[in-house]
Amino acid sequence: MDLPGPIHEILVLFGGFVLLLGGLGVVLLTNPIYSAFSLGLVLVCISLFYFLLNSYFVAVAQLLIYVGAINVLIIFAVMFVNGSEWSKDKNYWTIGDGFTLLLCITIPFSLMTTIPDTSWYGILWTTRSNQIVEQGLINNVQQIGIHLATDFYLPFELISLILLVSLIGAITMARQ
């Protein structure tokens, strides 16, 4: 979006603050329905960041796929779980929880140090020069594919990882 500097900064700070609160709600709330709604809030805030970064296609895909489908599916699945199962477990911290916390702290820091130093266009198969030459020769669907493979490669891969984690979580819940 082409917003003035202060408004853009306020929206980024607001989105980040709401994103942090929603993430804490997903992890800390004991009621799984409230956690699922917090996850929906997190996904909407991520979509807001994509709008602010002028990647409207990824933002709309985030809203439609993750907020509209995945989060509704999670809420639907959680509503079938017996509510008494969640209130009986009073063992709050285990060794696995500590390992998971350590992993959840180290992965974002390693990503924050790795991603800015990586030249993403050197990794990708298509380059900017090929994209400019082919723009007049291809249709809109192929242009979307080229944009997903060049400009929006990292957000597209991160969204696919989020989908993978949600599918693993759904399978784990279904087995229990």
From Swiss-Prot:
It comes from Sorghum bicolor. This is NAD(P)H-quinone oxidoreductase subunit 6, chloroplastic. The keyword Phosphoprotein does not apply. It is a multi-pass membrane protein. The lineage of its organism: Eukaryota, Viridiplantae, Streptophyta, Embryophyta, Tracheophyta. It comes from the Eukaryota. It catalyses: a plastoquinone + NADH + (n+1) H(+)(in) = a plastoquinol + NAD(+) + n H(+)(out); a plastoquinone + NADPH + (n+1) H(+)(in) = a plastoquinol + NADP(+) + n H(+)(out). Pfam families: Oxidored_q3. NDH is composed of at least 16 different subunits, 5 of which are encoded in the nucleus. Its main location: plastid. NDH shuttles electrons from NAD(P)H:plastoquinone, via FMN and iron-sulfur (Fe-S) centers, to quinones in the photosynthetic chain and possibly in a chloroplast respiratory chain. The immediate electron acceptor for the enzyme in this species is believed to be plastoquinone. Couples the redox reaction to proton translocation, and thus conserves the redox energy in a proton gradient. Its EC number is 7.1.1.-. InterPro entries: NAD(P)H-Q_Oxidoreduct_6 (IPR050290), NADH_UbQ/plastoQ_OxRdtase_su6 (IPR001457), Nuo/plastoQ_OxRdtase_6_NuoJ (IPR042106). Belongs to the complex I subunit 6 family. It is an enzyme of class 7 (translocase).
